[in-house]
Amino acid sequence: MRLFVGLGNPGSRYAGNRHNIGFMALDAIARRHRAAPWRRKFQGEASEAVLGSERVLLLKPETYMNESGRAVAEAQRFYKIALDDVVVFHDELDLGPTKVRVKRGGGNAGHNGLRSITALCGNEYWRVRLGIGHPGDKALVHAYVLNDFAKAERPWVDDLCDALADHAALLAAGEDAAFQNKVHLALQGRGWDDVRRVGDKQA
């Protein structure tokens, strides 16, 4: 079994926030792969799905971002899931909008959700870094990630989540490079190969 974790904050107040793109990705995967109904478990919302030939536990921690590791650690212990089988979907300021990078281990880049998971579970889990762009000034980051995606951003967010869901079976099978490439090609095919953050001017 693999564990797919989407990071975000619980409740309608945060549902459309840039920081919640991990939740959005998991919701899209659950819909596409006809996952079981979400239920309260492991200090979050949990579901199960079969992606390709792999059984996958889907988890959206409801601990708030800074305590995400508590939910991940509980689910990991219950199912005895190895850290190498844990995949975390999260927002990434250091990637432009629509850009996706998959990596194992590495730093937390100031992301409190990743910091919590690393502290409680270890560092060698997989990250699916979902680019949201950077506001350009460190002082603006907090407000930027806790604001909703702008109306103009919603089309690429929806297409990104659809592409992640379409190719999630590759990720479940451990084919991370193929997954990343397929998602990139899907977004490129929909015209999202040079998306700027809202407010940025085209070069």
Curated annotation (Swiss-Prot):
Domain of life of the source: Bacteria
Annotated EC: 3.1.1.29
Enzyme class name: hydrolase
InterPro entries, per database record: Pept_tRNA_hydro, Pept_tRNA_hydro_CS, Pept_tRNA_hydro_sf
GO BP: protein quality control for misfolded or incompletely synthesized proteins; rescue of stalled ribosome
Site (Discriminates between blocked and unblocked aminoacyl-tRNA): N9
Pfam families attached to this UniProt entry: Pept_tRNA_hydro
Main location class: cytoplasm
Reactions that this protein is recorded to catalyse: an N-acyl-L-alpha-aminoacyl-tRNA + H2O = an N-acyl-L-amino acid + a tRNA + H(+)
Binding site for tRNA: Y14, Y64, N66, N112
Disulfide bond annotation, renumbered to this chain: none
Residues annotated as the enzyme's active site: H19
Record GO terms (molecular function): peptidyl-tRNA hydrolase activity; tRNA binding
Compartments reported by the entry: Cytoplasm
UniProt keyword terms in alphabetical order: Cytoplasm, Hydrolase, RNA-binding, tRNA-binding
Record's GO cellular component terms: cytoplasm
Site (Stabilizes the basic form of H active site to accept a proton): D91
Subunit structure: Monomer.
Biological role stated in the UniProt entry: Hydrolyzes ribosome-free peptidyl-tRNAs (with 1 or more amino acids incorporated), which drop off the ribosome during protein synthesis, or as a result of ribosome stalling. Catalyzes the release of premature peptidyl moieties from peptidyl-tRNA molecules trapped in stalled 50S ribosomal subunits, and thus maintains levels of free tRNAs and 50S ribosomes.
Similarity remark: Belongs to the PTH family.
Protein name per UniProt: Peptidyl-tRNA hydrolase
Lineage, top ranks: Bacteria, Pseudomonadati, Pseudomonadota, Alphaproteobacteria, Hyphomicrobiales
